[in-house]
């Protein structure tokens, strides 16, 4: 170790040395370099390339002492470059401060490199050393830094540094409050150590730095980032998760303790400096808009390219979708597409490397603002962007903290960022819109992502609530911005049905879309950030969620955003004088979200929609949508229905039909319009909605969303059509509508009642689709939704929707909410399976008529079909979501699936049957039977009593055969000492086989194993003819599909056995 010199480090590939060093450090460095190096600066210097010995030995001392120095170093651009330029030697002179400083400087360099924020020189300088470090191994420290940084970031160097560093880290932890470091693997420690060296973490810092860097808008720095990110991404993905967990936690403690100089004396200042830099950078609106926009475009393009490489099709799709929507927008938002694309790539990048993901993500966030800056008001937004970057930086920090601190920290950070954002929103509505919407999007995303991360429902639920509450506040603040709505709309569009949604949205209003897109990157970025924060794994979901937004995000972001989008779309549509369609769509949309928004007058809603929806509707609707998200069915129902409905507005029939699940998403805009249209009712319902969120669990008949929105008609027609359709589904769907209808019944006219019914119907189908993604985040959203709903004033219509989700349980039969749910899932599913097509067609048809027919006529006509079909769709959707696990039809599906899967199994069984030994070895379902049959030759008679019995068992049922199979399996697998033992297994085995359900097919095969005649039957077993030897098997042969699935089950069982 000590023998290694800077020259050696430079000469030899640092990674190899690091690899060796890792081993050495693991064993020796912890003891030797730690103590000796602390005393001897020379060894430290030598170890500096190793980073562990150097930085640890020096940093344990220095970091405590130099923590301030680190911040100072960060503050002093020259010192960092000097350190870099000096390399380890220059630092050696100042060993204690130098080494730590050096280490810190390297981190700072990396940080600056990423953060080039207020130090463009340092950034570029650092950037040169950084990139050059790879090429230039002149500075072993730098080289190590790059390699170690990337590796550290980090695979090869990370653990090595971690080893020595961990011991060092104990003091470091003391000084840095990085206690988690110990608990975290050396990798985490080293990563954080890097972070600490770089004031606590390049990761935590990078969160700021990416954003800052972007704001600094130094393409070179961005390029270096991209390069590092690329390498890091490669290394990071495997290690990213562990690193992320450790680093994030480590970084989080540092960040959390960042506030305390003790823990992160240097990191705090560094972060503060970074933030200050960001603020300063942001302070220069012109610089920001120019630098940010250009760098974003360039660096983001690079990142986007790299990230897109990762994202690939997704990014391309998003780009294409964005581009499609962007035709008009592209001019205003040339940089926005890269930003948005970058956002998606950022997400992808985020997945591989969360810490660094923060960089791209935050960069994405910054670019959206920056992009928005040019579009909105570069100067205005620039300062706002400065503020937002701070808040975003905090958000980034919060996100970094989030993994360790958990979503609450992120929420707190988000809250702070929101507060800051809100301030800008007060001063700058545009920024607020963008920022607020991103925050909201982030909130929902966080909720969704959180929900996904944890149990998607557990963590998301608890955490989502605060976030969404915050979101509620933001929404209240945000209600004014239409751009927010547009943003939400755009975001939703991307996530939901990228092409379809974009097309629909674009038709609605490209201007809106343009603004939306500009704003949209922020939410998307936030989404990426949130996704990143939550976890690499979660990030993947997040990607899916974010671009698709249907599975997970749709609940929150999609619904909330969709609501905004739909609202905006509705506004635009109305502006486009699509009032008629909108009215019909509104009817449909309102049907989709029956409780959501049934205003006394659809037309009125359409008219007011553009006015009020912006103020109340968008935020309130968002809240309600979130609330809906909280309620599983209604949430997505609302979101989906809204989007779909919005699509319907664009192409009422075509879009709705095209996207049956999303079909009802657009109702949210229309709902919004209507609740807003019924401003008084909306307000009333707002108060009610507020109450309703509180009573969300009981929202069955609270008439929370103002009696206006829901009507008995809605209830009656919704429940009656649905009820006949399918009692459970009808109960749930109808119950929701009925509850809301009861509320809305009061003020609404009959026409609106129809609309309500209609809305209710879409709402239910929507809720069903929502269930898929909804279940994860639904609980979380529910909690958060309540606060959000409370906050939202115009959430009346949405509140009902939100309420609806829970109402399904407490619907018509409040006494049997659970039963309703279950029944809805099962019988409703079964009924829905039948009415599935009908409901889809009906919904589509209804949607089409809605678009064509005025609210009143269409409402009544459509309401009935929609109510029943929609509900069926809802139940159906629910069924589908469980993967048709609930509906009886789903059972057939399962069997079919099993059959499809089992077919290969049968083949494999046959091939394996080739040898008795193989068959015995393969206890799998049918194979087991074959084995058993072979066993049967020797044992079957005792076990089954006789081959005839075996045949009879299949006749008796798959279970019987299964039991036999299991028994045989036991024999074949364990070759139970005695037939009695085998016989005993069947009791348990039978139960197991029951799950297999159709192991009889294997029995045919096993008989084949037993005797030539049976073997013949066995091959036939695949075909119905296998009955030749086994009558029972013949029957099974008839149900060959079942056999195969059963066989699979059997095989699985045996494997477990």
Swiss-Prot record:
Biased composition (Polar residues): 537-547, 677-707, 826-846, 1047-1057
Tau/MAP repeats: 897-927, 928-958, 959-990
Chain positions found as N-acetylalanine: 2
GO cellular component, one term: axon
MF terms in GO: microtubule binding; microtubule stabilizing activity
Modification Phosphothreonine, positions: 419, 450, 497, 506, 546, 659, 916
Sites of Phosphoserine modification: 5, 60, 99, 254, 257, 417, 509, 515, 520, 522, 599, 618, 668, 685, 695, 761, 799, 801, 827, 902, 915, 978, 1050, 1056
Assembly, per entry: Interacts with SEPTIN2; this interaction impedes tubulin-binding. Interacts with TRAF3IP1. Interacts with KNSTRN.
Residue stretches of biased makeup (Low complexity): 262-272, 729-742, 785-812, 847-857, 1010-1036
A Pfam short name: Tubulin-binding
Keywords: Acetylation, Cytoplasm, Cytoskeleton, Isopeptide bond, Microtubule, Phosphoprotein, Repeat, Ubl conjugation
Protein name according to UniProt: Microtubule-associated protein 4
Organism this protein belongs to: Rattus norvegicus (Rat)
Basic and acidic residues: bias regions: 53-67, 743-760, 813-822
GO BP terms: cell division; cilium disassembly; establishment of spindle orientation; microtubule cytoskeleton organization; microtubule polymerization; microtubule sliding; mitotic spindle organization; negative regulation of non-motile cilium assembly
Modifications made to the protein after synthesis: Phosphorylation on Ser-761 negatively regulates MAP4 activity to promote microtubule assembly. Phosphorylated at serine residues in K-X-G-S motifs by MAP/microtubule affinity-regulating kinase (MARK1 or MARK2), causing detachment from microtubules, and their disassembly.
Region ranges (Disordered): 49-98, 246-276, 327-347, 382-404, 503-555, 569-927, 977-1057
UniProt function note: Non-neuronal microtubule-associated protein. Promotes microtubule assembly.
Cellular localization per UniProt: Cytoplasm, Cytoskeleton; Cytoplasm, Cytoskeleton, Microtubule organizing center
Cross-link (Glycyl lysine isopeptide (Lys-Gly) (interchain with G-Cter in SUMO2)): 812
Signal peptide: none
InterPro entries: MAP2/MAP4/Tau (IPR027324), MAP_tubulin-bd_rpt (IPR001084)
